[in-house]
Amino acid sequence: MQFCFRILILYISLSIDNNYLVTTLISLKENVFLHIFTLTFLFKAFLLKMAKRSVEELKRSADEEASVKRKEKKSKHEHKKHKKDKPSADKDRISKKDKKKSKKGKSKTKEESIEINAEEGAKIAQPAIGSANASNHNDEEAYDRYIKKHNISFADPKSSENLLPILQFDELDVSAKLREGLKNYKEPTPIQAATWPYLLAGRDVVGIAETGSGKTVAFGIPALQYLNGLSDNKSVPRVLVVSPTRELAIQTYENLNSLIQGTNLKAVVVYGGAPKSEQARAAKNASVIIGTPGRLLDLINDGSIDCSQVGYLVLDEADRMLDTGFEQDIRNIISHTPDPTRNGSRQTVFFSATWPESVRALAATFLKDPVKITIGSDELAASQNITQIVEILDDPRSKERMLDNLLRKHLSSGGKDDKILIFVLYKKEAARVEGTLARKYNVVGIHGDMSQGARLQALNDFKSGKCPVLVATDVAARGLDIPKVQLVINVTFPLTIEDYVHRIGRTGRANTKGTAITFFTPQDKSHAGELVNVLRQAKQDIPEGLFKFGTAVKPKLNAYGSRVVDVPVKAATKIVFD
């Protein structure tokens, strides 16, 4: 029996490699109970050893299987990419075309190269497998479909491969507090999804998208994440946002302020029409400054705002600011920020609804290798979420009767929180229409003759639903994001078709549906051709009565005539009288 016991111990020792313990057991004599206890212990150790080996073998097998799948997926993608490559004949054709261009002696300026990249970007808007956020995405075809569905084009002068859009908020590499601020949003809008990867990577970006597309959150989240990553002084302006109007500046401030709740960051808004001294005091120790060009420049020149450490600069609605004559103010403001071309660390972001020549020139001057991201078209276009209805009125005096009928119908059938926005052309007209409607409806007005406090109060009453009807001039037509505007009524047609698109863009925002009704009279016939084009592009029904005014479209005009002429203007000469 003792011999058998020693043989068993020897067998176990070979399995568990514990020579010291086995030697000790062999030295024991006749203590049978101790032998039995030890044998039980060794048997359990033996079973654990076998189980561990089985687990290791299963894990090794799983790793080998995963490796095979990765190789198959990579091979499949390389085959797909190879099929997408252009044939050599196309390359030769492009090469010959380039040679012809070079013979003509045309030199490309930096401004022109941005536009060329934009055209090329529309052709190469394919997601890059080697991009920074590619590891978070498993279904490449889903991203291809998303890009095609929203007509997203990229133009990156530094790379032909584009970063994949961020389709869900949980893919955002930002702090938990910032992500918490997005809980009221369902999913990123196309401009947010496409620009976030580049902005979070620190690239300069030009974002072109229609009104109501969520551009404020698009530049706001990366701006606040940039601040969270700073370890040094945050009590000086680090983020600067320039807005064209007071209302848009206030709205941007409210949106950003809601995102920084619970943090130690401070944001302020500055604009004309309010006491400058109070705004100067509020700007102290603020890390985020939002303001209009004129008031910002005043406070910078006074020394109340120091922009020498601004690392994130945003020009919101850049085309509107240039249209309204703020170009020189913008250039002066930017000159007070760090220059990235001279080892400065400023990240610059332009957001605009269009891509006119003036915005291109400004971008070429102040942005460093910008990525141009376009949602839809470079040209101004109405959202297809808006149902456009054009009412042809032969007699302009019938406007008030039709307006009364529309309000009665929509206020009785609409939802409790639904709002109606009425646009007119002139300030006196706004006051008259407001006074007429106030006899029957709960209505407020907003126009240029009102004080800033009265305008803000009227806007707040409209936003809160206290007054469901707002009569406004075009001062409220650009950039304002007023929730649940179900109906826009253009009582008077605007001066330009661009203003028309911005007016109706107050409804149908952020993937919601809306309706815009426009009164069109013979006095507006010069806009008939442009209006037909807007309706056709948005796939809307075109009333037959509109064609009687003609469909010709005049050449594009600017504020100074029918041609864009760059006339050099000499500096003013100071006259000194003896």
UniProtKB/Swiss-Prot annotation:
Under the heading InterPro entries, the entry gives: DEAD/DEAH_box_helicase_dom, Helicase_ATP-bd, Helicase_C-like, P-loop_NTPase, RNA-helicase_DEAD-box_CS, RNA_helicase_DEAD_Q_motif
Q: In the UniProt record, which is one GO cellular component term? A: nucleolus
Gene name as annotated: dbp3
Subcellular localization, as worded in the UniProt entry:
Nucleus, Nucleolus
Recorded hits in SUPFAM superfamilies, A to Z, give: P-loop containing nucleoside triphosphate hydrolases
Sequence similarity: Belongs to the DEAD box helicase family. DDX5/DBP2 subfamily.
Keywords from the UniProt entry? ATP-binding, Helicase, Hydrolase, Nucleotide-binding, Nucleus, Ribosome biogenesis, RNA-binding, rRNA processing
Task of the protein:
ATP-dependent RNA helicase required for 60S ribosomal subunit synthesis. Involved in efficient pre-rRNA processing, predominantly at site A3, which is necessary for the normal formation of 25S and 5.8S rRNAs.
- Which organism is this entry from? Schizosaccharomyces pombe (strain 972 / ATCC 24843)
Q: What is this protein called?
A: ATP-dependent RNA helicase dbp3
Please list the residue ranges annotated as the Helicase ATP-binding domain.
Answer: 196-373
What is said about the domains? Answer: The Q motif is unique to and characteristic of the DEAD box family of RNA helicases and controls ATP binding and hydrolysis.
E.C. number(s) listed in UniProt: 3.6.4.13
**Bias-annotated ranges (Basic and acidic residues):** 59-69, 86-95
Q: Compositional bias (Basic residues) spans?
A: 70-85, 96-107
- Protein's UniProt keywords contain Lipid biosynthesis: no
